[in-house]
C-alpha cells in the first residue's frame, strides 16, 4: 500500500471550552475558589480566570494528505500556537510521507529549541503530533490504539476529577479527585478548611472509595507535608502537583515526607522525555501524569511511558479525553484513566471537549470500551466557529 504525502497544514483558533477547558462561563466549578500559585495575591484568589488562565483558547490543527484524508487534533495554544504551526512548523510536514512521524517530531522539536522546550511551543508540537497520528490511523483505516500495539485490556476504568466526589461514586467511578481550595497564603484556617472538606467527602463516600487532592502547583514543601500528614487520617490516596513543576528537589523531599502508603503524583505541566527523566531519576513521585496534548504528543508519551515503566512508576495521563484513552488502553503501566467532570456543577458526565468535538465517548458506570473508529474517532462540530488567523 503506497502511503500518501502531506499536502496542507492548517491551524485554527476556537473560543469557549474545547481543549482550553478553563475557558468556561461564570459559575463553573473549575473556576471557583481553587488554590493556585497566584493565590498569594488576594485579588487573584477567588477565580482562576482573574489572572488569565483562559487567555490562550483552543488550537485546532488540521493536516490533509495527498489522497484527501484529513487528520486533526485539538489542544491548548490558541493564536500563539496557530502562528507557530503556520509560520514555522508547516515546513517540516508538507511534502513528507504520512508515516514519517518520528522524523517530523524531531525536526519540530529541535528547530524550536531556542525558543521552546516546554510551554505553549510543546503544546503546539503536541497538537501537530496528535493530528499526524489521527491522519495515519485514518489512512490505515484503524484506530490509533492499533498503531500503538493494540489494547492490553478490554475496557478502561476511570476516576473523576471535580468538586463532587460523592456524586462521582454514585456514577460508578473508582475515585474522586478534589481541587484544593485554600492556599498557604490563607494560613492555618485555610489548612483546616482543606482538611475539613476532605473529611466531609470521606464521610459521604465511605472508606473504600479513592480520594485525592489536586494542588495545582500552589504549595511549598512545608505546607504540602503538613497537608499530607493531616489528610492521611482521611485516607488520601495521593497528593497531586503540590509544588511548582521545576522544583524537582522539593518533590523528592516531599515524597520522603508523606505518610507511608500515600502517593505523590505530578507531571501535568512537565514536557518531553528529558523533563520526565528528571522526575523519575530524582525519585520525585510514584505516579506521573503527562498531558498528551502538552508533553509532546503520542510520539513523546511513548518514550515517557517507557522511562516510567523502567522506574516502576505508573503513568496516568492528565485529562485529554480520546487522546489519552487510545494510549492508556495499550499500556500495562497505565491501569486507569482520568475523567475531567466538565458539567458546571460536576453532577453529570459530559464530554471533556464539549461542544467542540462530536462522537467523543464518555464513561458509563465509570468504564469505557474505546471505540474502534479510525483515527481518534472524533469529528469537529461544524457549529463551532473556527478562525484561521495566519496562513503560510
UniProtKB/Swiss-Prot annotation:
GO terms for molecular function: L-rhamnonate dehydratase activity; magnesium ion binding. Signal peptide: none annotated. Substrate binds at residues 22, 48, 338. Binds 1 Mg(2+) ion per subunit. The record marks 338 as: Transition state stabilizer. Mg(2+) binds at residues 214, 240, 268. It catalyses: L-rhamnonate = 2-dehydro-3-deoxy-L-rhamnonate + H2O. GO terms for biological process: amino acid catabolic process; carbohydrate catabolic process. The record marks 291 as: Increases basicity of active site His. The active site is at residue 318. The keyword Secreted does not apply. Its cofactor is Mg(2+). It is an enzyme of class 4 (lyase). InterPro entries: Enolase-like_C_sf (IPR036849), Enolase-like_N (IPR029017), Enolase_C-like (IPR029065), L-Rhamnon_dehydrat (IPR023444), Mandel_Rmase/mucon_lact_enz_CS (IPR018110), Mandelate_racemase_C (IPR013342), Mandelate_racemase_N_dom (IPR013341), RHMD-like (IPR046945). Its EC number is 4.2.1.90. Keywords: Lyase, Magnesium, Metal-binding. Reaction proceeds via a syn dehydration. Homooctamer; tetramer of dimers. Catalyzes the dehydration of L-rhamnonate to 2-keto-3-deoxy-L-rhamnonate (KDR). PANTHER family: ENOLASE SUPERFAMILY, MANDELATE RACEMASE (PTHR13794), MITOCHONDRIAL ENOLASE SUPERFAMILY MEMBER 1 (PTHR13794:SF58). Belongs to the mandelate racemase/muconate lactonizing enzyme family. RhamD subfamily. This is L-rhamnonate dehydratase.
Amino acid at each position: 500500500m503506497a502511503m500518501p504525502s502531506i499536502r496542507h497544514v492548517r491551524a485554527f483558533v476556537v473560543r469557549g471550552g474545547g481543549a482550553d477547558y478553563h475557558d468556561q462561563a461564570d459559575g463553573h466549578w473549575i473556576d471557583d475558589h481553587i488554590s493556585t500559585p497566584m493565590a498569594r495575591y488576594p485579588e487573584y484568589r477567588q477565580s482562576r480566570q482573574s489572572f488569565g488562565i483562559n487567555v490562550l483558547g483552543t488550537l485546532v490543527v488540521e493536516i490533509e494528505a495527498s489522497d484527501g484524508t484529513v487528520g486533526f487534533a485539538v489542544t491548548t495554544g490558541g493564536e500563539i500556537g496557530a502562528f507557530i504551526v503556520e509560520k514555522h512548523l508547516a515546513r517540516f510536514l508538507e511534502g513528507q510521507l504520512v508515516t514519517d512521524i518520528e522524523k517530523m517530531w524531531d525536526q519540530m522539536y529541535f528547530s524550536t529549541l531556542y525558543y521552546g522546550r516546554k510551554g505553549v511551543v510543546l503544546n503546539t508540537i503536541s497538537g501537530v503530533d496528535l493530528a499526524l497520528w489521527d491522519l495515519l490511523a485514518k489512512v490505515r483505516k484503524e484506530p490509533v490504539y492499533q498503531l500503538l500495539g493494540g489494547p492490553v485490556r478490554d475496557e478502561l476504568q476511570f476516576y473523576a476529577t471535580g468538586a463532587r466526589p460523592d456524586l462521582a461514586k454514585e456514577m460508578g467511578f473508582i475515585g474522586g479527585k478534589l481541587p484544593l481550595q485554600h492556599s498557604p497564603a490563607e494560613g492555618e484556617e485555610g489548612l483546616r478548611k482543606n482538611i475539613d472538606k476532605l473529611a466531609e467527602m470521606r464521610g459521604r463516600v465511605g472508606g473504600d472509595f479513592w480520594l485525592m487532592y489536586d494542588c495545582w502547583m500552589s504549595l511549598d514543601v512545608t505546607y504540602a507535608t503538613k497537608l499530607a500528614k493531616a489528610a492521611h487520617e482521611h485516607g488520601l490516596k495521593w497528593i497531586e502537583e503540590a509544588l511548582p513543576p521545576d522544583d524537582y528537589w522539593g518533590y523528592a523531599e516531599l515524597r520522603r515526607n508523606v505518610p507511608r502508603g500515600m502517593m505523590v503524583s505530578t507531571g501535568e505541566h512537565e514536557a518531553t522525555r528529558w523533563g520526565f527523566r528528571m522526575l523519575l531519576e530524582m525519585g520525585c513521585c510514584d505516579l506521573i501524569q503527562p498531558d498528551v496534548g502538552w508533553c509532546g504528543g503520542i510520539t513523546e508519551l511513548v518514550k515517557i511511558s517507557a522511562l516510567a515503566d523502567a522506574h516502576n512508576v505508573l503513568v496516568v495521563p492528565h485529562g485529554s479525553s480520546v487522546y489519552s484513552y487510545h494510549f492508556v488502553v495499550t499500556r500495562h503501566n497505565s491501569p486507569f484513566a482520568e475523567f475531567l467532570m466538565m458539567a458546571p456543577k460536576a453532577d453529570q458526565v459530559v464530554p471533556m471537549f464539549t461542544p467542540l468535538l462530536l462522537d467523543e465517548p464518555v464513561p458509563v458506570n465509570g468504564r469505557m470500551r474505546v471505540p474502534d473508529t479510525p483515527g481518534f474517532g472524533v469529528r469537529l462540530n461544524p457549529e463551532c466557529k473556527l478562525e484561521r488567523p495566519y496562513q503560510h
